[in-house]
Amino acid sequence: ELGIEKVVHTSTSEVYGTAKFVPITEDHPLQPQSPYSATKIGADSIAMSFYHAFDMPVTIVRPFNTFGPRQSARAIIPTVITQIANRKNKVTVGALHPTRDFNYVTDIVRGFIAAMRSIESIGEVINLGSNYEISMADTVKLIADIMGVEIQIETDPVRLRPEKSEVERLWADNSKAKRLLGWELHYGGLNGFARGLTETIQWFADADNLKKYKSGIYNL
C-alpha cells in the first residue's frame, strides 16, 4: 500500500547476552540481561510480527560491537584512544575480562546495504560479526601498541556494569550473512582489527575531532 520494498530492522548482539555457546549463531537463546537488551528483543519481535502478519519484507540485522570514527565516547575504543591522545599514561576503563567481536564501521555499513538489497534475507535474522574474539584487556593493549605508548590500565568502578548485566562473551558466527548476503569482511581477523583501529586513531589525531571528546569525563 505504501510501496515499501524492504524494512531492515537494527537489532544488536546484546540480545544474546553472555554466550552459551560460540560462535553465536542466530538461533542462540535470547537473554535480556539488561533493560537495553530487553527492549531490543521486544523490538525484534514486533518487527518480525509485521513480516508474519502482513507479509512486510522485514530483515533483522544483529551487528556485533561496531567501532570507528565518531563513535560515542562511552565505548571502550574511543575512550582509550582519547585518553592516550591527551597524553594520559594511566588509562581508565571498565571491566577488562569480557570478550567482544569488534567490527569496523564500513564493514557493518556494507552488511546493512547488502541486507537491504537481498531478497533471500526477507523474514530472516542475520548476524553481522567478524568471527574474531578478543578481550577488552587485549584491545586496550593493542591500541597502546599501535599508538606507540606504554600505559598503565586502571579499572574504574564507575565504568563497571551491574554484575549480572555484564555480557561476558560475544563471538559471532557470520556464515549466514556470507551465504544470504554475499557479505565479506574487509577488516577481518586480528590484522583487520588492527587496520580498523589504525584508521580510527588517525581520525582522532585530527585536533578538531579530538576536541569534541572529553577524555577525563565518563558520561552516563
Predicted segments with their positions:
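Short coil/turn segments at alpha/beta junctions that flank glycine-rich nucleotide-binding fingerprints
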Residues: 2-3, 53-57, 73-74, 87, ...
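C-terminal substrate-binding subdomain of Rossmann-fold SDR/epimerase-dehydratase oxidoreductases
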Residues: 85-220
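N-terminal Rossmann-like NAD(P)+-binding domain of SDR-like oxidoreductases, especially those catalyzing
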Residues: 1-66, 146, 195, 199-207, ...
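Short clusters of hydrophobic/aromatic residues that line enzyme substrate/ligand-binding pockets
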Residues: 16, 23-24, 67, 91, ...
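Short beta-loop-alpha junction of Rossmann-like oxidoreductase domains
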Residues: 19-20, 69-75
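Active-site proximal helix/loop that lines the substrate pocket
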Residues: 12-15, 65, 71, 117, ...
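Conserved active-site helix of classical SDR/Rossmann-fold NAD(P)-dependent CH-OH oxidoreductases
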Residues: 41-48, 52, 78-81, 110, ...
